[in-house]
Amino acid sequence: MGVHFNICLLLLLVATISSQTLKATEKDDSTDENPFGIYRRGSQCAVYGGRCIPTSVRCPPNTFQCDLSGCSWSERCCCHL
């Protein structure tokens, strides 16, 4: 009786581990979504051809800092000349 119980527990453990492994290998679609990127595409900065650049980096050549909304608090909008 004890051996039969141990075998049942072992099978239950193997089945649980197998099902968890299958769940882990499924693709998680939520990681592909970038809601901030989607928001920025419709922002004033993007509509006028600007790009959101980190505040620690200077605007690229042939661009200037413009005061348009749509960038996060740690970024600024750089517009083309």
UniProtKB/Swiss-Prot annotation:
Signal peptide per UniProt: 1-19
Query: What does the PTM comment of the record read?
Result: The basic myotoxic domain of rattlesnake crotamine toxins (with 6 Cys residues) has been detected in this protein. However, this protein contains 2 additional Cys at the C-terminal region. Hence, this protein may contain 4 disulfide bonds instead of the 3 suggested by the myotoxin domain.
Residues cleaved off as propeptide: 20-39
Main localization (coarse): secreted
Drop me one GO molecular function for this one: toxin activity
- Please give the name of this protein: Small cysteine-rich protein 1 1
What is its subcellular localisation? Answer: Secreted; Nematocyst
- Known role: Induces neurotoxic symptoms on zebrafish. Has also been claimed to be implied in calcification, but tests on homolog proteins suggest that proteins of this family have a neurotoxic function and not a calcification function.
Give the organism, scientific name: Montipora capitata (Rice coral)
Per the similarity annotation, which family is this?
Belongs to the Cnidaria small cysteine-rich protein (SCRiP) family. alpha subfamily.
Instruction: Please give the GO cellular component terms listed in this UniProt entry.
Output: extracellular region; nematocyst
| UniProt keywords, alphabetically | Cleavage on pair of basic residues, Disulfide bond, Nematocyst, Neurotoxin, Secreted, Signal, Toxin
